[in-house]
Amino acid sequence: MNKTIVLAGDRNYTRQLETTIKSILYHNRDVKIYILNQDIMPDWFRKPRKIARMLGSEIIDVKLPEQTVFQDWEKQDHISSITYARYFIADYIQEDKVLYLDSDLIVNTSLEKLFSICLEEKSLAAVKDTDGITFNAGVLLINNKKWRQEKLKERLIEQSIVTMKEVEEGRFEHFNGDQTIFNQVLQDDWLELGRAYNLQVGHDIVALYNNWQEHLAFNDKPVVIHFTTYRKPWTTLTANRYRDLWWEFHDLEWSQILQHHMGEFELISPLDKEFSCLTLTNSQDLEGIEELVTALPEVVFHIAAWTDMGDKLKKLAVYNNVRLHPQIVPPVLDKLKKSTNLYLDINHGSADENFLKSLQEQEKTLLAFQSTQHGELGQIVFENGKVSFMIDTIKDFKKNGHLTCFRQLPSLTCLTFTASQYIEQLDYLAGQLPNVVFQIAAWTAMGPKLYDLSNRYPNIQLYPAISRDKLDELKEKMDAYLDINLLTSTSDIVAEMAHLSKPILAFYKSQNGNNGQRLYSSEHPERMLADLQKLITKDMLEKPLDIIQVKGIDETLDYIIEHNSSLVRFGDGEINMLAGHSIPYQDYDEELVSIMRDIIGQESREDLVVCLPDAFTDRFRFTSWAIPFWKDHMDHYMDFYRELCSDSWYGSTFVSRPYIDFEDKSQAKAQFEKLKSIWENRDLLIVEGATSRSGVGNDLFDEANSIKRIICPSHSAFSRVHELEQEIEKYAGGRLILCMLGPTAKVLSYNLCQMGYQVLDVGHIDSEYEWMKMGAKTKVKFSHKHTAEHNFDQDIEFIDDETYNSQIVARILN
């Protein structure tokens, strides 16, 4: 499609004409550009005309008579009288459809869609002016055939004569030159275009001050960008939208337009190419700015302000690497915020706190001096006068893409003593808190993992092979202790820290000893981060949530004995299943999980005690292999426990497991005696898996009066739960029921308790009793029956036992 475009200008406006033409030709081929003028030298046309021809386009010099009717007509100060030349378009341009463009605009994309718009017998199509009523005459898609037929030139001149007289006599307010005349003559004869075809940015600052939200809310790509009003990119620094783009087209070489159409060149914003820093200021005083600017010539410094700027700031424009943005508007500031690499919080006086918070949310690196820091927003803070330190930091960031050296004044110092190179979430914390120093100390040399972290994060400081004196010095100077080292315990050092009355923060999985630590899940390190930020701002830390209360083994047994209670035990396996997982002896089952969720939510009472693992308050009375298990378990599931469990107390799940996982095993014998006293001289009904054979080969149930057994599937017994309940009811009369059947035991115990039976869920009791009797220090596999959590019942050689066989009253097997 051949596209006919008309521009108008004079010899004082050739720079602007040239910029507009460059933008047209950059985005379009096959255009015919008429330039209405009276005094532009023919020499000026040669270069753009040559380039246009290579793109299948033309540039035509249209000279208007020197003495023209509009020479002395009224106009606004920033507008040339040549603007009235568009009255004469129909006289000089023969094409039927013409696009008129002012020369204070740039084209931002192809004009194909604009030229394809049907004018529907209207004289022109245009975009509304900022008043929302009239049209702006800077972009006019003209029905030139109709202009000729209806002698529009004559009508415009006649109306101009009448209106000019009213203006001269002071009877016409808000006169806007030929735009006013066009609207008077064509007030009902124009088609409205979308804003994209004439995005008027000259009123941006006015829109901001007057809260014209819609004016600044345009987010689509504009086709034409119009620099209306006197706030032009070449006359003012006012930071309206797309000001920088006008200068990019202004500086564009004609040859680069050809290269663009050959696929060899793209106009890329300097913001996307240069390394830059941003400062938004409310004052003229920027700490160390000239030293920064002169020392870092390859770094661009963007200085923005909501208001106009004073001479002190404007003088900085003499530096090639300074960009001033006075009277900036939010869209321009947002663009700078996204594009710049660093923010320099170096302005004295007040600051836009919401803007600074938005930078923090975007994880932008902020640098500040002590005297200019605004709030506690994770700034890297340098001592006053240490501009050279900030210079080195900017160089470091520019070279590496992140900070590798640490010259700032720390806002908080945290110490960790370690006996391994594994420090939980250290990289996350160091990255999120660049102004916090993380000191890592050890008695020995350190591994490569820690050195790698210290190279990546300049705020990690390593102290390998530390002396006692140096460690004591670090202890005294630290603000908080982070008990976050893994593997080898450092509980003795943490105990020392507890005497200093300084905060000790730990993850459940990294906790070393019970030393008053504030505990967090390592799966939510942002919670520890939030508390460290409170320590930076010296805010009070919130009181930790109350610990879930679980009675000890003896206290639980005493309660059961006193009240003849039933017992439902939830261990780690049941919690895994409640969280949506299958476990070795029970496939995941929605119905089972729903029932267990209801049971664990019950309040313990005299007839039913709900039990949880007694590992909420002390995970360090277990063996060396059990401690990390329970630390990891609580790290992963503590939130889940709090969601499920709201009762004021629970019994201990360990009532049937009082031996193998405890470091101190001396109490287990007495606890088993308490257990055995419950069924002494009582008739028992044991409900167990086919491989359990509880009491076979030991005296666990010797004091019972009699025993009956119901044998069930060892795996996924819940699939037969209704049959099991029916069989149990047949034989349960007058008997104490012992259930050893994994998650299914929870359902049976609860349901049978509701029917009035006393039921004890005592899974794993037989293995624990065997281990206690043999004095085992670790789990020993039994060859003739099930071993708790060992080998999943493989390689068992069952021994025929007449007593055991005689006790079986029912078998319900898969």
Swiss-Prot record:
UniProt-annotated stretches for the region GT-D domain: 542-814
Keyword annotations of the record: Glycosyltransferase, Manganese, Metal-binding, Nucleotide-binding, Transferase
Pfam families: Glyco_transf_8 (PF01501), GT-D (PF08759)
Pathway(s) annotated for this protein in UniProt: Protein modification; protein glycosylation
InterPro entries listed in its UniProt record: Glyco_trans_8, Glycosyltrans_8_dom-fam, GT-D, Nucleotide-diphossugar_trans
GO molecular function: glycosyltransferase activity; metal ion binding; nucleotide binding
Chain sites annotated for binding UDP: 8-13, 102-103, 226-232
Organism superkingdom: Bacteria
Function according to Swiss-Prot or TrEMBL: Involved in the polymorphic O-glycosylation of the serine-rich repeat protein PsrP. Catalyzes the third step in glycosylation PsrP in this bacteria. Transfers glucose from UDP-glucose to the terminal glucose moiety of already-glycosylated PsrP (using truncated substrates with PsrP SSR1-GlcNAc-Glc); the C-terminal GT-D domain is sufficient for this reaction in vitro. Also transfers galactose from UDP-galactose to the terminal glucose moiety of already-glycosylated PsrP; the C-terminal GT-D domain is also sufficient for this reaction in vitro.
Family as reported in the entry's similarity comment: In the N-terminal section; belongs to the glycosyltransferase 8 family.
Other remarks in the entry: Encoded in RD10, a pathogenicity island with an atypical GC content that is associated with invasive pneumococcal disease. Pathogenicity islands account for greater than half the genomic diversity observed between isolates. The main function of this island seems to be correct synthesis and export of pneumococcal serine-rich repeat protein PsrP.
Name this protein carries in UniProt: Glycosyltransferase GlyD
Organism: Streptococcus pneumoniae serotype 4 (strain ATCC BAA-334 / TIGR4)
Organism placement in taxonomy: Bacteria, Bacillati, Bacillota, Bacilli, Lactobacillales
Gene: glyD
